[in-house]
UniProtKB/Swiss-Prot annotation:
It is found in: Cytoplasm. Keywords: Calcium, Carbohydrate metabolism, Cytoplasm, Glycosidase, Hydrolase, Metal-binding. This is Alpha-amylase 3. Monomer. The profile of production of reducing sugar from soluble starch by the action of AmyC was intermediate between those of AmyA and AmyB. Its EC number is 3.2.1.1. One of its GO terms (cellular component) is cytoplasm. CDD domains: AmyAc_bac2_AmyA (cd11316). Belongs to the glycosyl hydrolase 13 family. It is an enzyme of class 3 (hydrolase).
Length: 499
C-alpha cells in the first residue's frame, strides 16, 4: 500500500515538474518571438502571368525560396486596391489589388504558406484612405453625408498646420501625408468600429497579424493613440489570441517605449541607425549598451515586449547603397542585427545586395532573379536605376558565390533558427579596449553564445579567457582562432558556443 502511495505521489510530482518545465521552456511562447520576417513589395517580387507586375501567384511559386532562406513569416506591403503604385492610398479594404490577383489567389497563398509553416501579416493602412475611397467621395460631396464625420473637416482653413488642410467645395479636410490621402477621424466611434471590422475580415481569411502603418499619427496625441491601439489589440486577441501587431513608430527610443503600453511590438528605428552608423564609422557607437538600455525601457511598459529589429525598410536608402556599394560592410551590418535578440525584418533584396536610393520608387525596384533579368518571374513595372541587367546584383550570381551576401545571410539565419539564445537570450557586452571590436554574449537557459565582430578595415585581435575549440565555432568569416585568441580580418565575424 505504501509503495502504491509512493508511486502515485512520484507520478504526480513528475507530471507537475514536466508541466512547469514545458511552460518555462517557452512552449506557450508567442510564435512571433522566434520568427524571421521578410518584408516584400508584391509588385516588385515575382510575376506569374507575364505582365511584368509581381503578383500573389508569383509569391506562391516562390514560397520555397523563403523556406530555403529560413524565413518564417512574410510582411506584405499593401495589397488592397489603390490609385498609387505603392498601395498606401487604399480605395477598398475588402479586396485585392487587381494587378496582384484575386481573393481566391490570396486564400490560396495563405493556405500554401501555412502548409510550409510560413506566417503572413498585412500592411494595415488606416491613418488615412485614398481621396477616391467611397467614404471620402461621399464625405466631400455633402455636409449631410453619413460619412462626413469619417474624416476631419473644418469650415475655415485653420491657422495651425495650415499646409495640411485642403479645400473642397464643402470645406477644408486634413491630410497629414498628401492631399490625396485624407486622414480618418478616429474620434468618431463608427470609424474605430470600421477598422476593427476590416481587421476581423482579414483575420478570418487566415492572416496572422498586421504591420500598423503610421501608428503614431492616428490622433495628434500619443496617449490617445496608445489607448486606441490597446483597444484594437485587445479586440483582435479576442478573435485570434496569437495575433501579431507591429507598429511603425518612427521616433526615438522613449517614444517607442510609450507605445509598448498598447502594442506588443514596434520597429526599433534608433537601433537600426546605431548599427548602420557604427559600421559606416568602423567604430562601435555603443550598440549593446544602447540595446540593453532600450530593452529595460521597453520592459517597463510591457514585460512581454517583442522588439522588431531591422537595418532598412521601403522608406530608406538601401543597405548596400548606404555603405557606398561595399559588400563587406553590408555583410557586417547583417551579421550584427541577425545576432541580436528580437524579431529580425529583412527587406526584400537586402539578402542579395540590391541597391537603391530616393525617390521611393528606386528603393522598391524589381527583385532580380537572374543577372540578365530574363527569368520568367522577373518583374519590370519600372525601369530600374540601380539594379540593372548585367551588373552582378542578382540571386543567381549570389547563389554561386560562397562568399556572397546571400550565402552569408542564409548561414546566419540557419544558426539563428538553431540557437534560440540569438532570438531571446539575455545580452551582455564583452568589454574591449578597442571600440572597433564589437563583442557580446547571449545566454538562454543552458545555451551561451559569444559573437565577435571587427568593424575595422584592418586586422584586429580579440583575446578570450578560455580556449576556443573548433567544434564550438558556429560561424567564422574572414577570421581564424588560435587557442584563446581570435585573429579578426577586416569586417569579420565569429560566432562561437562558450561554456
Amino acid at each position: 500500500m505504501k509503495i502504491k502511495f509512493f508511486i502515485k505521489r512520484t507520478l504526480i510530482f513528475i507530471f507537475i515538474l514536466v508541466t512547469f518545465l514545458t511552460y518555462i521552456h517557452g512552449y506557450n511562447e508567442p510564435w512571433y518571438k522566434n520568427a524571421i520576417f521578410y518584408e516584400v513589395f508584391v509588385r516588385s517580387f515575382a510575376d506569374s502571368d507575364g505582365d511584368r507586375v509581381g503578383d500573389l501567384n508569383g509569391l506562391i511559386d516562390k514560397l520555397d525560396y523563403f523556406k530555403n532562406l529560413n524565413i518564417t513569416a512574410l510582411w506584405l506591403m499593401p495589397i488592397f486596391p489603390s490609385v498609387s503604385y505603392h498601395g498606401y492610398d487604399v480605395t477598398d479594404y475588402y479586396d485585392i489589388h487587381p494587378g496582384y490577383g484575386t481573393m481566391e489567389d490570396f486564400e490560396n497563398l495563405i493556405r500554401k504558406a501555412h502548409e510550409k509553416n510560413i506566417k503572413i501579416i498585412l500592411d494595415l493602412v488606416v491613418n488615412h484612405t485614398s481621396s477616391r475611397h467611397p467614404w471620402f467621395v461621399s464625405s466631400a460631396s455633402s455636409y449631410n453625408s453619413p460619412y462626413r464625420d469619417y474624416y476631419i473637416w473644418s469650415t475655415e482653413k485653420p491657422e495651425k498646420n495650415s499646409n495640411l488642410w485642403y479645400k473642397k467645395p464643402t470645406g477644408y479636410y486634413y491630410a497629414l501625408f498628401w492631399s490625396e490621402m485624407p486622414d480618418l477621424n478616429f474620434d468618431n466611434p463608427k470609424v474605430r468600429e470600421e477598422v476593427k471590422k476590416i481587421a476581423k475580415f482579414w483575420i478570418e481569411k487566415g492572416v496572422d497579424g498586421f504591420r500598423l502603418d503610421a501608428a503614431k499619427h492616428i490622433y495628434d496625441d500619443d496617449s490617445k493613440n496608445i489607448q486606441w491601439w490597446k483597444e484594437f489589440y485587445s479586440y483582435l486577441k479576442s478573435i485570434k489570441p496569437d495575433v501579431y501587431l507591429v507598429g511603425e513608430v518612427w521616433d526615438n527610443e522613449y517614444k517607442i517605449a510609450e507605445y509598448y503600453k498598447g502594442l506588443p511590438s514596434n520597429f526599433n528605428f534608433p537601433l537600426s541607425d546605431k548599427i548602420m552608423n557604427s559600421v559606416a564609422n568602423q567604430k562601435d557607437l555603443g550598440i549593446i549598451e544602447f540595446l540593453e538600455f532600450e530593452r529595460e525601457l521597453f520592459g517597463e511598459n510591457n514585460t512581454d515586449f517583442a522588439d522588431a529589429i531591422f537595418l532598412r525598410n521601403h522608406d530608406q536608402v538601401r543597405v548596400r547603397t548606404f555603405f557606398g556599394g561595399s559588400i563587406d560592410k553590408s555583410i557586417l551590418a547583417g551579421s550584427i542585427y541577425l545576432t541580436l535578440p528580437g524579431i529580425p525584418f529583412i527587406y526584400y533584396g537586402e539578402e542579395i545586395g540590391m541597391e537603391g536610393s530616393k525617390p521611393d520608387e528606386y528603393i522598391r525596384e524589381p527583385f532580380k532573379w537572374t543577372d540578365d533579368m530574363k527569368s520568367k518571374y522577373q518583374t519590370y513595372w519600372i525601369i530600374p536605376r540601380y539594379n540593372l541587367p548585367g551588373n552582378g546584383i542578382a540571386l543567381d550570381t549570389e547563389e554561386k558565390d560562397p562568399n556572397s551576401i546571400y550565402n552569408h545571410y542564409k548561414k546566419l539565419l540557419e544558426i539563428r533558427v538553431k540557437c534560440r539564445a540569438l532570438s531571446n537570450g539575455k545580452i551582455e557586452r564583452i568589454k574591449t579596449q578597442d571600440r572597433s571590436i564589437l563583442a557580446y554574449k547571449l545566454e538562454l537557459e543552458d545555451e551561451k553564445i559569444m559573437v565577435v565582430h571587427n568593424l575595422n578595415r584592418i586586422e584586429n585581435t580579440f583575446n578570450f579567457n578560455n580556449e576556443i575549440k573548433e567544434k564550438d565555432i558556429l560561424y567564422i568569416r574572414n577570421a581564424k582562432t588560435e587557442k584563446n585568441k581570435i585573429i579578426l580580418g577586416p569586417y569579420s565575424t565569429v560566432i562561437v558556443k562558450i561554456p
